[in-house]
Each structure stands twice: as C-alpha cells, then as structure tokens.
C-alpha cells in the first residue's frame, strides 16, 4: 500500500506525464490500424498457412507415397464422398463371399412315451432359448392340459393350431334315440324310482379288460362318491345314465386314464 502511495506522489510531481500518456495513445491507435499479418511481421513471428501438426502429417504421408501408389488400382474412390484433410482411403475388400454351410445343433427331443414295470412315462423336453417367464408359462400350459383330462377324454378331442396358440375341442355327442332299446316297465312306480341315477348307487357296473391277463373292473357309485351331494357337486345330475355317472366318478377320482388304457369303457 505504501508503494502505491509513493507512485501516486511521484506521478503528481512528474512534469511530462501528459506527454507520456499522449504518446501511449498514439502508439495504440497505430497498432489498431494494422492487420494481424503486419503485427506478426513486426513481432518477428512467421505466419503459417497451416499449423505445424499438419506439416508433420504431410511429411509422414510423403514417406509412404510409394506404397499408396501400389494400391491405387485396387479401389475406385467415390468422387461424391466428402474429403477429409489428412485422411487417406485404403483399398476396399475385393474378395467374394463364400457360401458356408451353417448347422444349428439342438438338444430338443420329441415327446416319448416310455413303459417299464412301474408303468408308463411321457417325457417332454423343454424348448431351448426360453426366458424364465416363458419357461414358467410353458410349464403352466402343460399342467393345464393334464388337469383338463379330469373332465374329458383327450383322445376324443380335436387339436387345432391357431395364430395365438392351440385350441382343443370336444364335440358333444348326443345319443341316437332311434338306436336305444326301450325298457318295458310293468309298474309305473319303478320308472319313477330309476329316474334319478343315484338310486343305482349300490349297483355295480363291470368293464371288460383289453388284455386276458387282467380281471374285469367292477365298480359302483358308492365306491366313487361318499354321497349324492358330492356326486352333484362335481357335475353329476340325476338324468345321467348309469355308465355316464360311473365315468364321471372315475374322472373325479383321477382313475379314468388308467382305466381307459386297461379296460373297454
């Protein structure tokens, strides 16, 4: 702070201060009128049209010119392509693509039904490339198909493929009334008694085996349902035939598929 005060005191006593300020303004005015090129020449700085790093790139390009000339015949430069300074286009690949046989290996196998002393087994191989969510959806679909066998015979169903998936249908078969042999009832009250199929709950029905080594299957509604209420709760009704009620009970007890394979239902 003392030095600044001394400078101020000195400038007050400097008799040629106004003259010095005028000379400085005159010099600055002259420099403003000159071009940048003239200023560079005054300061002794040589002005280059291109920076020094471009000059170094030109020197390296000059050394590799013979090699570039040797490769000029391998490609034709695109005249419309934008030229980038310092970039040298190399030769294009001129070899032809060869046909290569590509073989995709897969471990997927078609469903196989296996038989042994313990029974039969159907193996379904999981499709490859499924995500965790897709795998879960696939397993739920298979499970739904298996559970649907409780309510119908899959062998009697039709299989239709659609754009959204698969449609499985079973056509409702109505009995031919002209082929039904009427049963003559001598007493009207007997007809009323058998109008509800549950009245035959203690009556057994026999199914013949498909192989001579097996015994006939004899079963009644009492063995399949604990009560008429249970029979009604799973879809039964009094107007069913005795055989229809028995088959419903086999499906309810999850015995239908086994019985269908071994016996003539």
Swiss-Prot record:
* Residues at the site labelled Involved in oligomerization: 138, 141
Matches recorded under SUPFAM superfamilies? Phosphoprotein oligomerization domain-like (SSF160892)
* InterPro entries tied to this protein: P-protein-C_vesiculovirus, Phosphoprotein_C_viral, Phosphoprotein_central
What is known about its processing and modification? Answer: Phosphorylated in the N-terminus by host CK2. Phosphorylation of the phosphoprotein is required for the transcriptional function of the P-L complex.
Q: Which residues form a coiled coil?
A: none
- One GO MF term: RNA-directed RNA polymerase activity
**Region (Interaction with N(0)), start-end ranges:** 1-60
The Gene Ontology CC terms held by the record are:
host cell cytoplasm; virion component
List where in the cell it is found: Virion; Host cytoplasm
- Which parts of the sequence are annotated with region: Hinge? 171-193
- Keyword match Phosphoprotein: yes
Provide an example Pfam family for this protein: Phosphoprotein
Provide the positions where the record notes the PTM Phosphoserine: 60, 64, 226-227, 233
Q: State what protein this is by name.
A: Phosphoprotein
Q: Give the source species.
A: Vesicular stomatitis Indiana virus (strain Mudd-Summers)
